[in-house]
């Protein structure tokens, strides 16, 4: 564990979280083992109907990706077969964390890449498994088999609850929070730095200079 802990609140469906990847690599390169990272899954939606009720469509999703290309990550905007929820993908990341601590980061990045460059549906277990089979040392089938395990469900719910503790935080003052399903939550990719008696919050997407 590094001398400074970094908690990242994120979700595999968020283009802002995907677009911050270059900045995260810079932080890792500059500070290395001084930083101890922890990934907390927000769980943006449990059901696709939540997105549909907000007016999301496959075409709208593809079109919205165009404005994120300027941040340097690859996007292949094409309308997906349908709108999908994010809970199953978040559970896959949590399952990876429990099965093989540390592998959750690779699983998370693989799902991010597949989300924005392929037709992947984040709530389709078969498609999630296909995306993860490309990762050496990751047992995609074992991850999928545990998506509904009690341990995974409990850990996922803890992540969701922690992500929804942003009320009154610096992130809220930065107007980098949301309230889509009850409590005020952190938006992706919020970073919380803790160490040397300080707690600093960079809410939502930020340029590398903010970190």
Label each residue range with its predicted role.
Residues 1-7:
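Extreme N-terminal starter segment of soluble prokaryotic enzymes
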């Amino acid at each position: 564990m590094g001398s400074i802990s970094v908690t990242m609140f994120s979700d595999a469906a968020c283009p802002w979280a995907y677009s911050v990847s270059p900045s995260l690599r810079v932080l890792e390169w500059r500070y290395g083992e001084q930083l101890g990272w922890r990934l907390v899954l927000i769980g943006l939606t449990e059901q696709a109907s939540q997105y549909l009720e907000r007016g999301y469509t496959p075409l709208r999703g593809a079109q919205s990706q165009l404005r994120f290309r300027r941040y340097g990550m690859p996007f292949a905007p094409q309308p997906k077969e349908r709108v999908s929820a994010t809970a199953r993908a978040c559970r896959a990341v949590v399952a990876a964390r429990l099965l093989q601590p540390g592998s959750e980061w690779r699983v998370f990045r693989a799902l991010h890449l597949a989300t924005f460059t392929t037709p992947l549906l984040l709530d389709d277990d078969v498609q999630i498994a296909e995306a993860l089979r490309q990762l050496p040392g990751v047992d995609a089938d074992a991850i999928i088999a545990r998506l509904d395990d009690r341990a995974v469900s409990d850990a996922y719910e803890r992540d969701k609850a922690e992500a929804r503790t942003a009320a009154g935080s610096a992130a809220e003052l930065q107007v980098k929070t949301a309230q889509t399903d009850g409590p005020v939550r952190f938006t992706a990719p919020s970073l919380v730095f803790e160490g040397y008696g300080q707690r600093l919050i960079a809410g939502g997407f930020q340029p590398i200079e903010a970190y």
